[in-house]
Amino acid sequence: MRAIVLTLTFLLSFAAFAADDKPPTNAQALELARRWLDAQRAYDEIPGMSAAIVHDQKVLWSGGTGQADPTTNRPATADTLYSICSVSKLFTSVAVMQLRDEGKLTLDDPLSKHLPWYKLPAAEGGREATLVGVLTHSAGLPRESDFPYWTGEFDFPTREKIIERLASQQPLYPSDRYFQYSNLGLTLAGEVVSAKAGKPYDQFVRERILQPLSLTSTYPEVPLDEKGKRLAQGYSAKRRDGTRTPLPLFQTRGIAPAAGFASTVNDLAKFAMWQFRNRDAKSDPVLDPRTLREMYRPHFVDADFETYWGVDFATWKDGGTVFVGHGGSCPGYRTAFQLDPEKKVGVVVMANASGINTGRFAKAIYDIVTPTVKNEATTAPDLSAYTGSYDAFPWDGETIVVAWGDGLATVDAPTMEPMRTLERLRKTGEHEFRRVLKDGSLGETYKFEIGPDGKATRVWVHSNPYPRM
């Protein structure tokens, strides 16, 4: 419909509106986020997605769209398990910082101090890799252990094989000079955790992080016994013909501290709420609040001044807002974990397909919902007769119509920037609305036809009908 309806300008997230128009409620924004996510997933041909958004200590919404396993029609839900891959690194870094706070190590320690078998020489002009170097991906280490585990059957090496092969690997760069994302580095950080804790890495993480935070659906390794049950079936990126291929299930074995975990959006929502709770606390049984703030703070800035990294938290600024978090990408799975610490808003998005950007999905949900998190519910007319999706063929996919304040709003789909396509509609007559321009003036008319059940069957805009889907 966007090619038919003349738009004066793209709207910013919540453009100025006339005094007659009430601001949207949080419930209305959540409904738009849910409808948009469902539509965008379908247009991107992603089998299934799950998402959650939290504000401080409240889960505003969590749910799923599509299918966790299309072969059995098992739906994706907020409790569907996905590989979260590199989000695993956050748990590893928390474990390292717990041991640091106990005086068992320092971030400036060279790896060889705690791992006697670590023999990689320093690159010319650099120093030996340190803990802070691996936790900020600035140690100059290779990206991977020297095995081809990201292709073929995803045959990840055991820790014994990683240690054996490490002896023949070399640093890529001098330490502290370049940002070089390294799964090998975080794998070694996990080995330090095990060495200093005196117990297996997974046991330490369960006892010190997962159990205290009641993360009952988070696993340090993909649980194979959940295949066909709660675990989503992973799919490849799309091929040229638009198809996706189901991928074999894997366990990351020795790479688990860097990429092994599986979780649900509901559990990572708990992880987000703990961080918001921790941030304002004087003490915390899992991690000193001062330490969490230290982890958020950038510890390495790349020479391009575009890449900032905390203690394994990525940190970035978008439109004046500072975000922290991490992404995850394993064969058949993508995850985004994004936090706005100041507003205490967190978004988690998981998908069972490669070749997509879950971070963009998370940011779109954030943009829709965050401006409304403090908006109280107000009495508004029942406009449910008009809400839904209307077919914009052949010019577009569809137009989503939702209640918005005391009127309606439309969003065109597909789009990865739903708030930039949002148009507000004001009721001006029986089943009749007009578009509200940025300056509050009224534009074209939207006339809804009502069927026998009292629901709209189509909407007329610029003398053209668009049927309800």
Model-derived features: positions:
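Bacterial N-terminal signal peptides
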Residues: V5-A15
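Catalytic loop of the DD-peptidase/beta-lactamase superfamily, centered on the K-T-G motif
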Residues: A19-G63, Y149, E153, E164, ...
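Active-site helix/loop module of the DD-peptidase/beta-lactamase fold
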Residues: L32, G48, A78, S83-V87, ...
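A short, polar/charged loop-to-alpha-helix boundary motif
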Residues: A68-T77, N357-A364
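Catalytic nucleophile serine of serine hydrolases
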Residues: S86-V87, Q180-N183
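Active/ligand-binding-proximal structured segments within catalytic/core domains
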Residues: T92
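Mid-domain, small-residue-enriched loop/turn segments at the edges of structured enzyme/sensor domains
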Residues: T130, L184-G185
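The feature captures the short pre-catalytic strand/loop hairpin that immediately precedes
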Residues: E160-L172, K238-R253
